[in-house]
Amino acid sequence: MFLRAPRERCRPPPVNTFRIGTRGSALALAQAGLTEAALALAFPDLRTERQVFITRGDKKLDLSLLKANEAGGKGLFTKELEDALLRDEIAVAVHSLKDLPGHNPPGLAITAVLERAPTADVLIAKHAGGFEALPDGARIGTSSVRRARQLRWLRPDLRVEEWRGNVQTRLRKLAAADEVAGILLAQAGLERLGFDLSAGTLEFENVTFQIESLAGRLLPAIGQGAIALQSRADRPEVSAILEKIDHRETHIAIRAERELQRLLAGDCSMPVGVFTSLKGDHLHLRAILFSADETLPPITAEAEGAASEPSKIAAEVFAQFP
């Protein structure tokens, strides 16, 4: 993500120390760093401090994220940070927006979002040729229900398996698992961790993996590629700071996506994919929704309209689902 210098340096409202809550993974810390960099551009004199939390999702590595009834998708990676906000221990919680449930807890709000990174999923494979060249029955790892359902729809022959852990852990497991052909990860997370994907390969611990973007094949998760800055609704001094680093175009897009998520009564484990494009004042939203019955085909829907009415566009998409 490229940070654009603000038009003017801002004097922050009176806040002694701006405490930033984050998970402790390398990706979460990188996203906290992007937040700190954006704040430093807007408020050079603002003092920030990190507070790291371990969430239930970080602890319970035995939970299957492909089984929503077992994982309990709502707040699996966010609740501990939200509780800290409600206790007033931190000023802001930094989240991968795709991890957030459709509803904020009472008293909390997504006050700002940083500029969105690329939203595509990528295939990380051991052999060249990409998605179409995967052999019949190839084993593919993912922890996402959305990715798993889209993969099975596109390639019913593939064997999709549970694949948990942080990015580095998953790459090490892939290198060591001769029987697994590849895994799926978000392009945004890989780039934020400093991986160079421009050559179509990924170098990690002396292993070269082949990379293929699945943009156009798989629709991303709601909020994928966006960093959400969540704060208390009753802290106007905090809101005033965060609003200065809010990225308007990203915020419009995620308002449409999260409204659709709310209408579907969904959490981050729901098998729904979305793609939102914003051109000027025109917003287009496309979605794919999978039934609990895996024998049924997915339903696709789309709508477009004024960027000033993201909720209306989401409602039009929702109305096309049975």
Give the residues covered by each predicted segment.
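Small-molecule-sensing regulatory modules
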Residues: 6, 13-61, 67-70, 78, ...
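Short, well-ordered beta-strand segments
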Residues: 19-21, 93, 111, 141, ...
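Short, well-structured alpha-helical segments in soluble
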Residues: 76-88, 176
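Extracytoplasmic loops/domains of multi-pass membrane proteins
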Residues: 83-86, 95, 100-103
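Short, Asp-centered acidic motifs that coordinate Mg2+ and/or phosphate
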Residues: 90-94, 181-182
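A conserved helix-loop-strand patch within extracytoplasmic ligand-binding domains
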Residues: 97-100, 106-157
